[in-house]
Amino acid sequence: MLDLQKKLSPAFYTILSLPSTAMGFALSVQISALSWILSTQYNLAIHEIGLVWAAGPIAGIFGQVIVGMISDEVWFWGGRRRPFILIGGTLSALMLLALPFIGVISTGLGFESVVGIAILIALTLDLSINISFNPTRSIIADVTPSGNERTKGYTWMQTISGTFGVGAYAIGAIWGNYALIYVGAIIVFLISFIPIWFIKEPEKLSEKEEVLSVTPDKNKWISALFSIKPLWGFLAYAPLGMFKKLSGQSLSPGILELACLLLTVYGIFQVLKQPESEVANQRSNEIGFQRILAAHAFTWMGIQTMFIYMFAFIQNKMNFLSENDLGKVISLSFLLLNAVAAILPAIFLQPLSEKWGKV
């Protein structure tokens, strides 16, 4: 163990924050460049771009759940989090590099359409980011004592990751999205692959953390599936919609959408109808988690719509822009969004929470 880690010095907190920063940076590149490059370089229609984006989050949801379960219980390559960070960081960098070459890859593999390869690359990129997200956060808890030191670790992570995220959009706004893709791939690989070798993980978690990490239900995979009940409709719609599009199958308009909407409403109703106060503590925590999922699901519908389709809005409203300038405007827009998101909580929300209380 390095002296930096023993002393929990600022340098160690910086190193500890970099793997999570890498995943956040990769996500920023994806948000800024994926829709833009699919539209401008590969001429995909707006509904095809939505199809490409649908693949990633589904894999990400399952990836986070699965990796979150198994990363507590494995040990290889000198750690329980290290393998997932190394694999996820390397694959994320490679998939970013693949974005400008989707057409070349598709032609080389003998595909007439780039949609299938674009879905595969987007799927791998999103899955790579998501399988690393939980380990990059869990490693902070693994190597810091509970209390102020652990809180400090997460604070450093948020600060450094947020700064890099704003920096990603700044690169795209100034030099364009192609520069962002190539620079992003290098940064993601370096700050995910190198720092993790300077962090020594404990081979045995503390007794309290072991209890929290072990799911008492023997059928933990089924338990995990039921814990995300409010997302069932969303989870079903994306793969079924992709299959319908790629296979050429036809359904009556709105049938699939209505069925998935009803499934979503059913899942949310099941969560909301049972008061947390009337169930055991562990079940109460699960219900609270499911209610957060329900709220976030609809929130993310709006946010993802902005991420995916903002390029089309700008193309329509500012059709005088060149393809490169379009990419710069998209990056500038997300730069301003993230800058406001970084400043607003400290300046406005914190004073309001102190006045009216936190919820």
What are these model-predicted stretches?
Residues 1-9, 109, 115-120, 131-132, ...:
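Intracellular loop-helix junctions on the cytosolic face of multi-pass helical membrane proteins
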Residues 2-60, 236, 240-253, 289-320:
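Helix-loop boundary and gating motifs at the non-cytosolic
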Residues 21, 51-58, 123, 155-163, ...:
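Transmembrane alpha-helical cores of Major Facilitator Superfamily
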Residues 29, 33, 66, 133-139, ...:
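Transmembrane alpha-helix boundary/hinge residues in polytopic small-molecule transporters
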Residues 45-53, 81, 114, 118, ...:
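Juxtamembrane helix-start elements in MFS-like secondary transporters
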Residues 59-63, 260-271, 331-351:
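Transmembrane alpha-helices of Major Facilitator/SLC transporters
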Residues 62-79, 176, 343-358:
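Helix-to-loop junctions at the C-terminal end of transmembrane segments
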Residues 85-112, 241-245:
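C-terminal ends and interior cores of transmembrane alpha-helices
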